[in-house]
From Swiss-Prot:
Gene (name only): LOV1
Domain of life: Eukaryota
One CC-aspect GO term: plasma membrane
Annotated NB-ARC domain residues: 44-336
Positions of LRR repeats: 459-484, 485-507, 509-530, 575-600, 601-626
Family label: Belongs to the disease resistance NB-LRR family. RPP8/HRT subfamily.
Name of protein: Putative inactive disease susceptibility protein LOV1
GO terms for biological process, alphabetical: defense response to fungus; response to molecule of fungal origin
Pfam name, any one: WH_DRP
Organism of this sequence: Arabidopsis thaliana (Mouse-ear cress)
Family matches, as InterPro entries: Apaf_helical (IPR042197), Disease_R_plants (IPR044974), LRR_dom_sf (IPR032675), LRR_R13L4/SHOC2-like (IPR055414), NB-ARC (IPR002182), P-loop_NTPase (IPR027417), WH-like_DNA-bd_sf (IPR036388)
Keyword Repeat among record annotations: yes
A single MF term (Gene Ontology): ADP binding
Keywords annotated in UniProt: Leucine-rich repeat, Plant defense, Repeat
Lineage: Eukaryota, Viridiplantae, Streptophyta, Embryophyta, Tracheophyta
Amino acid sequence: MKSLGIQEIIDGASSMSLQERQREQKEIRQTFANSSESDLVGVEQSVEALAGHLVENDNIQVVSISGMGGIGKTTLARQVFHHDMVQRHFDGFAWVFVSQQFTQKHVWQRIWQELQPQNGDISHMDEHILQGKLFKLLETGRYLVVLDDVWKEEDWDRIKAVFPRKRGWKMLLTSRNEGVGIHADPKSFGFKTRILTPEESWKLCEKIVFHRRDETGTLSEVRVDEDMEAMGKEMVTCCGGLPLAVKVLGGLLATKHTVPEWKRVYDNIGPHLAGRSSLDDNLNSIYRVLSLSYENLPMCLKHCFLYLAHFPEYYEIHVKRLFNYLAAEGIITSSDDGTTIQDKGEDYLEELARRNMITIDKNYMFLRKKHCQMHDMMREVCLSKAKEENFLEIFKVSTATSAINARSLSKSRRLSVHGGNALPSLGQTINKKVRSLLYFAFEDEFCILESTTPCFRSLPLLRVLDLSRVKFEGGKLPSSIGDLIHLRFLSLHRAWISHLPSSLRNLKLLLYLNLGFNGMVHVPNVLKEMQELRYLQLPMSMHDKTKLELSDLVNLESLMNFSTKYASVMDLLHMTKLRELSLFITDGSSDTLSSSLGQLRSLEVLHLYDRQEPRVAYHGGEIVLNCIHLKELELAIHMPRFPDQYLFHPHLSHIYLWCCSMEEDPIPILERLLHLKSVILTFGAFVGRRMVCSKGGFPQLCFLKLEELEELEEWIVEEGRCHFFVL
């Protein structure tokens, strides 16, 4: 096994002001697998070696990175994943977290979805059919598959059936067990990461704590107080050479600006500074450092951090959904100065990220697809603190027939159920303490609730109820849902429902309502009663008899799946706080719609779909030109040409065009939108034969996708054009 070089992490993790950091983070594109963050510097030779073996060595299929938790395996894998040589060599890429709890079908599904994203939902595909399709796909192309955090050799044995013996595919694998890579491929090339030395640990911590940015944005060093330096060098020894722990300690110390403040941190860590002679002692000291980062949070951030304990391991936590949970519980609130729940939530998460307690994974393709995650060691701290403070109770249900012990329900105000079919057992006894109930289904499973279930009546003071992917018997949501008059959050996303009761009108305090469930449904005209709503997602398919009056929903900030077939365009005029809108046009109301959209001065994200038969041509897409603050625009409307660039807001960042049938090349206009970060043209967006990217165009573009443009024959990129990150 070859040992990696020094891991000096995050050049840019200086202790900027919160405002500076927020501005920077809002502009950076981040994803957990798709990330350009420079977490590793000083290991260029190791990254080059790993990339070289993936691309140039035909004798191996697997490159593995091994080492203990928190040492930087995933971070190193990202650097290799994004290496130019790797990106150019392979036809497709998949990144899958495996972890301790997984099923082979889930791993296979994730690989297929990332390699073939255009093939839609495969959650109901038979496992054997999926295996065959994936095997054949990997036989026919050059693909890189990253399996992150494979724990045991047996785990590989469960996954390996989809991988042909010898083809163009390669695998990058990370594991705490160096034997996993050898087991997967006896000829594998293995790297074993090492811990940082005390000197390297202090150098990393010092970068995080003491570097500042000057007015030009350049990093500059700040003179280090001798007493602080002496204490800091001792404290980093408690981090056991793990970059994760060093980063967390650095994030904590960056909030302390005087010697007495440092002394208090030093005294808290002090008992762990001496006498550490075993691995257990080292782990205890590491967890003490991680715990101390939590203990030093202000109360509002503590609650925000603890809320993350609800989610299963490696769960991609959608930040907007998280903000709505927090708002429903009163943990975050909007302010009189115009600060919204989303603004406040982003402030909280970015502060936790600055302290290196979470990572924020911002999808550079879309403004709204933003997630956060925790390292598994930090998650252990989160779970421990949540249990210690009776913040929530987690039920990991291993089988569909498992039940929840009613006695345990009295311990906490919050319940999180991971998998199984245990929800009906909640109705065995009335519990007036529980305020939130979140259900997380695993992969393609569904919990089944009978129409007569008493579980709603048994939890009368619920404020948060997430029943995503729950299957209701007979498709009927029980009318007893209307008894939960204290609800602020209700999600029925991807639930199996065909009938909604009129008792929903009783839920007048709702802030968040997600009706994005499966199947056709009649929605009673009761949503107008929910005048506190901030977020509303309507069903994709509704019965023709559905007619909704929504003009009283004046506090809405997000409205999804609005259709002119079921509600009046004029209702939008009253929703002056809207930031995000997805809208289906089903009639000839384009003029009214255009003027209505022009009144939405806060609108930042617009998704517009034409469902008229026959489709109407919107010449130049004038229908959206009055939206003066747009940052993200998705259009699926017929328009012969794209509007001129000067008609759009200068900070438009993301454009997604499909089924537009544009006859004129849109690139000469798009490339002059100076702040564009992603452009997607697909499914007949352009029906011409030739596209040209000019020299100097797209100065900030990170992502360009051209797909299913059947008439396109020639794509010209003029010499001097800047590098596209992904194509």
